[in-house]
A protein has these predicted regions:
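A flexible loop/linker signature enriched in serine peptidases of the S9 family
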Residues: 1-8, 19-31, 37, 45-52, ...
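Terminal targeting/pro-maturation regions of precursor/exported proteins
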Residues: 317, 481-484, 489-553, 557-558, ...
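PDZ/PDZ-like domain segments forming the peptide/carboxylate-binding groove
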Residues: 574-627, 825-826
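Conserved blade-ending motifs and adjacent loop-strand segments that build the rim/top face
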Residues: 6, 41-55, 285-298, 406-413, ...
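Cleft-lining beta-strand/loop regions that shape enzyme active-site pockets
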Residues: 595, 602, 617, 622-623, ...
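Extended, small/polar residue-biased N-terminal targeting/export presequences
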Residues: 539-590, 652-678, 859, 865-877
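A short helix->beta-strand "capping" segment at the edge of beta-propeller domains
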Residues: 87-104, 185-191, 391-409
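Blade-terminus and WD-like Trp-Asp/Gly-His loop motifs, strongest in beta-propeller folds
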Residues: 10-17, 54-60, 107-114, 147-155, ...
Length: 877
């Protein structure tokens, strides 16, 4: 076909004629074409929805799906909808009651540390810390999240997405005699926000009078609980939310300020920490003022300082990925800073002096008090004592009062500083997974406290004795004194509503696209009409496989990349193993005839004496007959030893061998290396060793490190040109790193005593290069070739690449087996053109024909070598 768009699903009518689906009319329809003619005919004329699932019967009858129906079509006739009426008993239930003992996704600790609230499959629960008694607070098919306890412990605030809109809700103990949610008999819920804008991630102010929340995902707003008046604290233009839950802010102890992440103008990849006045007067202070990434600030030392994470000291990202972080502290108070820097000895002396002074003052004060003082005045004194004084900040010198707390940079999780400021507890990955580490800031010692803790937000109790966290669906309590860990058990009654839950996920996905799709006009589609068109199928869907298909079809109407839904059911009980060989498909006798043995596969051991041409006659004692389905013989044998009976026709000998079978992913890895080795060998042979070759497998850090290592190695750095192969790359985020690596211009040489030992820049490719690309380059594998061409680094060779350069968020649902994607960050060139749906054309267009691929011919690679030889010759002149 020749349509400059999408054609798919061809089916043969006869040896010359075929049918296929084409979007040439604006919607997928059935087209007819033949090998003997360049003409094609549109057979169906459907609009609004695409034709899908084209197939053909032996008698030439076409069958396809359209708008939820099945149609048939005979040559010369009109499409006929197949009337289907299925009579069946309803065996699936609308409500399934379960007891859940795991699956918690986030937690909030009550102020008295007697109970913990958590989210389980989108509902709010509270459980006792001593017993597994659990109270369900919400029971909806929709989703609740972002829980927080009020300072008095009598209310819980959370966000809930009901009727397609996230709003803030509060559940409160209605009976004044009841103190705990776990055992409460009367809990009342009220909706706090009444806006038409997305509102979630609420947090109580420490005085309990107000609740802060995010509106439209990045604007910080505050609602006064008494008056219900709402004010804006920080405009949303100063932050950007890529995925829900990625924002962070925290109230100050005096309820007057908020610490938050801050991008300012254009600082998406260089975040700072900002101090924001909670009154809504617009006062914002960028505290960190750094080109590095500074995030996740927490108030410490009663508001006199903050700790936060920064990647300024650790290993830098090598290929846009992999930067390591550290925990830092910034002081807003000189006295607190000087106290923090004291040695253990000096601090002990100071504390003794302070203790003596306090005792003296209390003694003097006691003499002046009336011994018959009534309870009312006593309560007044207590209230005055508990009153939090307004914080005062010395911000002018804050950058001179920064201390790095962690000794070793690493990938970090959460971190907590003790109330005295003498120890830091943090999650880090020094030894594989996330562990809990203790940094003694006075002794300058680091020790492992809890192995295999996992990664998650840690909550410290008021006494500072324990931390609570949720990881892997379980709630844990850890003593920071000795690292002992206690699971917090719960028994949550969960009402699973499969139909209601799928309806919620459908509406949620529709709304997420409306709110977050990278273009506000959603590519001009009538998104409202598509919701109605697809939602009508929900009552007939009783499983997630069909639901995922329907959701994907609706998302496919967006005409955008990175859309669609995925369903991840529980894996098969037994996975089928592989033997790492190609079989001779033309062989018709008993057994499996080996055509090729994959390098580094199970048979790639010399002592086995198994070569191409040998026949596998038996697998674990079972003979393989001609045409037999042998795959069941390998079920459940990944990583296990398999006993094989081998016959070698060349020698007439039979032998018994034992190999360790491999998984499909392991075999795919061997096939990939085989393909790369073949390409590298081909380039060496075609260029006589003058041209280097490298393949960029993915747009990620491991791939970048491979590319960097190979092209700057002694083997390749002295070659005259480079072929950068990006074919079949599925994307990631590496465009600028690769473009920078390949755009080096030599500006000086290092020559000690007449010997050339290197050039500057030494960390870039300095010679001609080209980029190979093909039809299935995707996402950032479209973005990098585009950047390469835009910066005029070299030529693109291969086939046109569809415009798919957007950044996606694949969101896992409350049913974690369902995931869907939203392309939400568009990339716009300096001419104002979005790269999405903007095809990238090569400078030299070359197609690899299927018949060439079957015999190992790669016309694209040949063209690249030819072009690089020209460039190498030109560079010599």
């Amino acid at each position: 076909s020749s349509f400059n768009g999408e054609d798919r699903n061809p089916v043969w009518a006869d040896k010359d004629t075929y049918y296929y689906l084409s979007e040439a009319s604006g919607h997928f329809n059935v087209h007819k074409a033949s090998l003997s003619s360049s003409q094609n005919v549109q057979i169906t004329k459907h609009t609004q929805h695409p034709v899908r699932f084209l197939s053909i019967a032996d008698d030439g009858t076409l069958c396809y799906g359209y708008d939820g129906g099945i149609y048939t079509l005979k040559e010369g006739g009109a499409p006929k909808k197949v009337e289907i009426s299925v009579v069946s008993d309803k065996t699936d239930r609308d409500l399934i009651r379960r007891i859940q003992r795991s699956g918690a996704r986030e937690i909030a600790l009550s102020p008295d540390a007697k109970e913990v609230a958590f989210i389980l499959r989108g509902d709010v629960y509270v459980t006792s810390l001593e017993y597994n008694t659990t109270k369900q607070i919400t029971n909806t098919a929709e989703q609740e999240r972002n829980i927080d306890f009020s300072p008095d412990g009598r209310s819980i605030v959370y966000a809930s997405e009901r009727e397609g809109l996230w709003q803030i809700y509060q559940s409160t103990l209605a009976n004044k005699d009841e103190k705990l949610f776990t055992y409460a008999t009367d809990i009342q819920e009220e909706r706090l926000t009444q806006s038409s804008a997305t509102s979630f991630q609420p947090l109580y102010s420490p005085d309990g009078k107000e609740v802060a929340f995010l509106e439209n995902r990045s604007e910080i707003r505050v609602i006064n609980l008494a008056t219900k008046q709402v004010r804006t604290v920080m405009d949303g233009k100063f932050e950007y939310s890529y995925s829900d839950g990625d924002q962070w802010y925290q109230w100050s102890p005096d309820s007057r300020w908020i610490l938050t992440n801050y991008i300012g103008v254009g600082g998406w990849n260089n975040k700072d920490v900002a101090l924001v006045n909670a009154s809504g007067n617009g006062e914002i202070h960028n505290l960190t003022q750094s080109g590095y990434n500074d995030t996740g600030a927490r108030w410490v030392l009663d508001g006199k300082a903050m700790i936060w994470e920064s990647d300024r000291a650790g290993y830098r990202s090598h290929g846009s990925w992999g930067a390591e972080g550290d925990i830092y502290i910034m002081f807003f108070d000189l006295e607190a800073y000087e106290r923090f820097l004291m040695s253990k000895e000096d601090l002990a002396m100071l504390e003794e002096e302070e203790k003596a002074k306090k005792e003296s003052e209390e003694s003097e004060a006691g003499k002046d008090k009336d011994k018959k003082k009534d309870k009312k005045s006593g309560a007044k004194d207590k209230a005055e004592k508990d009153k939090v004084k307004p914080l005062e900040f010395d911000l002018e010198n804050r950058l001179d009062r920064i201390v790095r707390l962690t000794r070793h940079s690493s990938r970090l999780g959460d971190a907590i500083l003790t109330k005295k400021g003498d120890k830091l507890y943090y999650q880090a990955t020094f030894e594989g997974g996330f562990d809990l580490w203790e940094q003694d800031l006075k002794e300058n010692k680091t020790k492992l406290l809890v192995k295999g803790m996992g990664r998650g937000m840690m909550i410290q109790d008021k006494k500072g004795e324990n931390v609570y966290f949720c990881s892997g669906g379980n709630i844990q309590k850890v003593s920071i004194k000795d690292g002992s860990k206690k699971p917090i058990s719960f028994e949550a009654l969960f009402d699973y509503k499969p139909y209601g839950e799928r309806a919620y996920i459908f509406d949620h996905a529709w709304q997420q696209v409306k709110d977050k799709f990278y273009k506000e006009d959603i590519h001009g589609v009538d998104w409202e009409s598509y919701r109605d068109a697809y939602r009508r199928f929900l009552p007939a869907i009783n499983n997630n496989y069909d639901f995922q298909e329907m959701l994907s079809e609706m998302l496919g109407e967006l005409n955008g990349s990175h859309t669609g839904a995925r369903y991840y059911p529980d894996g098969p009980t037994l996975s089928t193993a592989n033997l790492g060989v190609f079989y001779d498909e033309s062989y018709e006798g008993d057994g499996l005839k080996i055509k090729e043995i994959l390098k580094k596969g199970p048979f790639a051991i010399k002592k086995l004496d198994v070569t191409p041409g040998c026949i596998i006659e038996k697998i674990d004692g079972t003979a393989i007959k001609a045409g037999m389905d042998y795959f069941p013989l390998l079920e459940g044998k990944v990583g296990k030893k398999v006993h094989l009976a081998i016959y070698n026709p060349a020698t007439g000998k039979r032998s018994q061998v034992v190999v360790k079978a491999i998984s499909s992913s392991q075999q795919t890895e061997l096939l990939y290396k085989r393909w790369v080795d073949r390409n590298r060998k081909m380039v060496d042979e075609l260029s006589g060793g003058r041209i280097a070759y490298v393949h960029v497998r993915d747009m990620d850090s491991p791939s970048f490190r491979t590319v960097y290592s190979e092209i700057l190695s002694d083997k390749n750095r002295n070659r005259e040109a480079l072929v950068v192969d990006t074919r079949h790359n599925g994307g990631g985020w590496l465009h600028d790193d690769l473009a920078t690596l390949l755009s080096g211009k030599e500006y000086q040489r290092f020559v000690p005593h007449g010997q050339y030992i290197g050039s500057d820049p030494f960390n870039k490719w300095l010679k001609p290069s080209c980029v190979l690309m093909c039809e299935d380059n995707y996402s950032n594998a479209h973005g990098f070739p585009w950047v390469y061409k835009e910066l005029q680094i070299g030529k693109l060779i291969g086939t046109p690449v569809p415009g798919t350069m957007t950044a996606v968020w694949w969101e896992t649902q409350i049913d974690p087996s369902i995931v869907f994607g939203i392309p939400q960050v568009g990339c716009v060139d300096m001419r104002g053109q979005y790269m999405e749906n903007n095809q990238l054309n090569p400078d030299i267009e070359v197609y690899n024909k299927p018949e060439d691929s079957l015999i190992g011919v790669d016309k694209q690679l040949e063209a690249a070598v030819k072009e690089m030889l020209k460039a190498a010759d030109a560079a010599k002149k």
